[in-house]
Amino acid sequence: MDDRLSWKFHIQGLSKKLSRTIGILYRLRKMNSPKSILTSIYFALFQSQISYGLLAWGTACNDLIDKIFFLQKRAVRIISNAGFNDHTQPLFKKLSILNIRDIFKHQIASFMYEYESGNLPTIFDSFFKRVNESIIRD
């Protein structure tokens, strides 16, 4: 986060890291590496970078999230050996990869489940209040 309370600087740095991973995937695909290896590398090097801290920066403006999503689509096309203009939604499904927005939703759902189960520190109680048996964020 920068001095203007924006995630732009963080996402630019993340984009550079993800671009390097895309280069690795591309070179490995050119060496005829199996799709299973490419997928494993994607999860180890790409998705792990996306997931780290996503609960904090996942609410950044759509323009910034779209930059990451664009890189994610490139990675999925490389793994699938698909063309530049091929639609990626079926590729995501075939590879069992969630897009960045779905990863964010999953992390929120997991966090709220852990909160409701009482598995989180009590400090998080001050973040939420109950209204008619529902939880809303302060």
Predicted segments with their positions:
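Hydrophobic/basic alpha-helical segments
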Residues: M1-D138
